[in-house]
Regions:
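Intrinsically disordered, low-complexity, mixed-charge
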Residues: 1-89
Length: 89
């Protein structure tokens, strides 16, 4: 299962991508996270339904300096060939 999410709020310049990286790796998820030009952060993660539910809930928390206003999330079954979890540009 794949989770695709766009996170809105104060999520750039506050360590959000590195925090997502740590959360994803701690859960054993594969995928990526990146900053977008519009000030959002985009995430794509692969895992079980339960893992992705927990991960999505964690996205609402974010690191201490962040403020998450919205998480736009969708799920799909299209297989990916992710190699671990990484920050992309």
């Amino acid at each position: 299962m794949i989770l695709h999410a766009i996170v809105r709020g104060r999520v750039q310049g506050v360590g959000f991508r590195y925090w997502v990286l740590e959360q994803a790796r701690a859960q054993g998820l594969k995928g990526w996270v990146r900053n977008c030009h519009d000030g959002t952060v985009e995430v794509e993660a692969e895992g079980t339904e339960d893992e992705l539910f927990e991960f999505e809930q964690n996205l609402w928390r974010g690191p201490v300096l962040s403020r998450v206003d919205q998480v736009l999330a969708s799920r799909h079954d299209t297989p990916r060939d992710f190699q671990g979890f990484q920050i992309t540009r």
